[in-house]
Amino acid sequence: MQAGRVQAVQADGHYTRLIDGAGRHFCPWSLSKVEAHLAGDTWVVFQQEDPQAPELGRYTGALAASLLTVFGAAPERPRRFYCPLTKQPMSAGEATQALTAFFAGLSRQHGGRRALFCVDHSLATAVLGGERFQAVKLGEMPALAVDSLQEMLDRPALAKKRSWQAMVAHGFAGSRG
């Protein structure tokens, strides 16, 4: 489903449904949960493959730690964002507003001026409103969405290469890139 056709987002605790203008439901992702880590001036954001789990999985967690090292991040407790926020329907615009407010609040309290999202295609287009590998704005904050950690594990040669190329091209290569 194209992001422009999304009328509402509804969660039942396990799956998220995108609802179009005709009331049809689409389930491109499970209840989404992302965790954000401040790394210098960049919020590095990871989509959890299992939103019911308390943290990233064993392999995605190791990959996340490696990526955070590229940004020179110190280990700390991640900040988490759930979408939709409740089991009530939430429009794609409301989800974007909630995510924008979440990062604006984090930036005011902890710093950070941009965000790098490691998320799947569905979440990037529905909530960030843009295609992956292209810079977008999240409110006033520059943002870039690249492949999710799970995609980087499933297809490392393709996903890591295209994600890294986009990060370099848009100035999101971390403190060591």
Predicted regions and their residues:
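A polyanion-binding, active-site-adjacent surface
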Residues: 1-177
